[in-house]
Amino acid sequence: MKDPYRSTINYYQLEAPAAAATYESVDFGGVTDRVLRYIPERGRLLEVGCGSGRDAAYYLGRGFDVTATDASAHMLSQAFRLHPDLEGHLVHHQLPNPLPFADGAFDVVTAMAVLMHLTAADAETALGELARVTRPGGIVAYSVSTNRPNLDPEGFDPKGRYFVCRNEDEWSALNSASGFLPVDSWTSRDLNGRVGVQWVTFVCRRG
């Protein structure tokens, strides 16, 4: 089996401009606005897997003290190109490696369309890291795809990206094991219009 992380990151390294353009074209406002219902104004916010910087820039514009990470250096370059206000807010980091931040450093942590790229064991580790850097009582919000019809037997899509598709109940169990208290969750269709791709978004409170 090829290295799932190297293969996934390599796609984003090679296709960063096109991937960033796709992300920028998607109206994600319904998700971010729903998350905003539960988070404090102008808090410390970490976005893990910021991609094109779309959401990080949105939160920055709303007055949050934003830190945004991504595993692809080329995607970070696109984020800065598209959103120059993110200068000084971008950090190169790859899960499931420990996040380079202190315990309880953030009021809010988001990870949209990230954790499903991790192996089963590493997703658990990553959720533990999200919990660690969130202050007690803080909010963790993340989305994952629960179904992708075009994966090969090893979990790779035609672009070489690796996915693990758990169902909503399995992710909920991982949330509980990570010490997260449920606040809100919802399922949704794919905003890019891909047939058969389904998503679930969780908003949790760190216990």
Which residues does each predicted region cover?
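Short alpha-helix
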Residues: 163-178
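Class I SAM-dependent methyltransferase SAM/SAH-binding core
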Residues: 46, 52-97
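Short conserved loop adjoining the S-adenosyl-L-methionine
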Residues: 98-103
